């Protein structure tokens, strides 16, 4: 009886894994980023350190905005070092982003990834532990000495620390690699600094990727990210002007006000919602042909081969290419003619870039 029960449980687990694999395999690449965690073991997420425990923790620290290829180089080293000492990989990151606390008046923070997106990308990387530490005004006042002694050593019991080429931490970012080497000797943990990851002789950084996105250079941005840039939002009601010219659009309100929005223009995108994916053309801008308010930015997408009301739906926009700048046309008919050309160009792009 016990053997029969064991066989049934084993068959059910195996069937579930096969289902997950088939499901993920059937999705386009950009959707697999948010589905692959079905087949990965889930990361253990910690929002405080009171009950944190890991075997021989191998740790890295940072904001990891974008979880781009430079970050993934660090995460890969994290896995290797954890394996070498029979340890577990740990990423220590922050919420909110430190700049929102130490420089709240700047108001120009633009993130490549929301916290939810970042968690999913970390899960995709297969790490063991993710610490999302509350970045408070009090925490920001910790000196680098206090942070190492109280947090890295006193609470996490770090055995190996992996840092990037430009890593600095602590109050006013005064802690650097030379200081960490002294701490490693004092507190008996190992440390390694990784070289910068280059692409086309330029270093990969979150700043470089943000600049590329603002300029509409998604070839550079997506290459550096290692995946297609995504924007999540909710479909809200608009003025329904698109229907009058046979190009109905879904108006999007971004899910996170700190998420970077590409510059004004027309883009080739894929649209994901309700486990479906569509091609589409997206306009970001002030809609100067039909709107006199130049300060109002709208995000609206015309979804190809789709015409249903989806108000309130959560939607994912995946960016492939910037087609052109936003323009003001002399009439709605001229706008309609240009949109028809845009659609033809985008369909051609997707046909030639499968």
Where are the regions a protein language model picked out?
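Glycine-rich, Lys/Arg-enriched anion-binding loops that position phosphate/diphosphate groups
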Residues: 184-283
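Short hydrophobic targeting helices and cationic amphipathic motifs
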Residues: 7, 15-17
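Positively charged, low-complexity intrinsically disordered leader regions
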Residues: 33-57
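Residue-level signal for inorganic ion chemistry
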Residues: 68, 122, 161, 221, ...
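N-terminal catalytic cores of NTP/NDP-binding nucleotidyl/phosphoryl-transfer enzymes
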Residues: 51-109, 114
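Phosphate/ribose-recognition catalytic cores of enzymes acting on nucleotide-derived substrates
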Residues: 238-354
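N-terminal Rossmann-like or analogous alpha/beta NTP/dinucleotide-binding catalytic cores
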Residues: 100-165, 169-187
């Amino acid at each position: 009886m016990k053997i029969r029960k064991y066989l049934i449980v084993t068959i059910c687990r195996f069937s579930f894994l096969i289902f997950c694999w088939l499901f993920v395999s059937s999705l386009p690449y950009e959707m697999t980023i948010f589905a692959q965690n079905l087949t990965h073991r889930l990361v253990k997420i910690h929002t405080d350190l009171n009950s944190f425990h890991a075997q021989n923790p191998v740790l890295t620290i940072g904001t990891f905005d974008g979880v781009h290829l430079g970050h993934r180089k660090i995460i890969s080293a994290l896995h290797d070092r954890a394996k070498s000492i029979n340890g577990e990989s740990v990423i220590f990151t922050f919420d909110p982003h430190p700049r929102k606390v130490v420089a709240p008046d700047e108001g120009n923070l633009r993130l490549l990834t929301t916290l939810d997106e970042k968690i999913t990308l970390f899960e995709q990387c297969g790490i063991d532990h993710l610490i999302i530490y509350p970045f408070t005004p009090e925490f920001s006042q910790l000196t680098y000495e206090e942070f190492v002694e109280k947090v890295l050593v006193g609470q996490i019991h770090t055995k190996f620390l992996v840092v990037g080429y430009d890593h600095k931490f602590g109050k006013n970012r005064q802690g650097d690699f030379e200081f960490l080497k002294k701490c490693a000797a004092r507190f008996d943990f190992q440390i390694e600094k990784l070289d910068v990851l280059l692409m086309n002789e330029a270093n990969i950084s979150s700043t470089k990727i943000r600049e590329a996105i603002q300029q509409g250079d998604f070839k550079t941005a997506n290459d550096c990210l290692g995946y297609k840039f995504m924007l999540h939002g909710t479909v809200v009601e608009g003025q329904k002007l698109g229907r009058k010219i046979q190009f109905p659009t879904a108006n999007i309100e971004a899910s996170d006000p700190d998420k970077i929005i590409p510059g004004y223009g027309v883009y080739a995108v894929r649209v994901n919602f309700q486990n479906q994916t569509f091609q589409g053309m997206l306009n970001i801008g002030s809609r100067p042909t039909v709107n006199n308010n130049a300060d109002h930015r709208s995000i609206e997408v015309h979804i190809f081969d789709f015409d249903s009301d989806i108000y309130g739906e959560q939607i994912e926009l995946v960016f492939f290419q910037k087609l052109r700048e936003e323009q003001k046309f002399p009439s709605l008919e001229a706008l309609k003619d240009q949109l028809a050309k845009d659609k033809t160009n985008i369909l051609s792009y997707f046909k030639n870039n499968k």
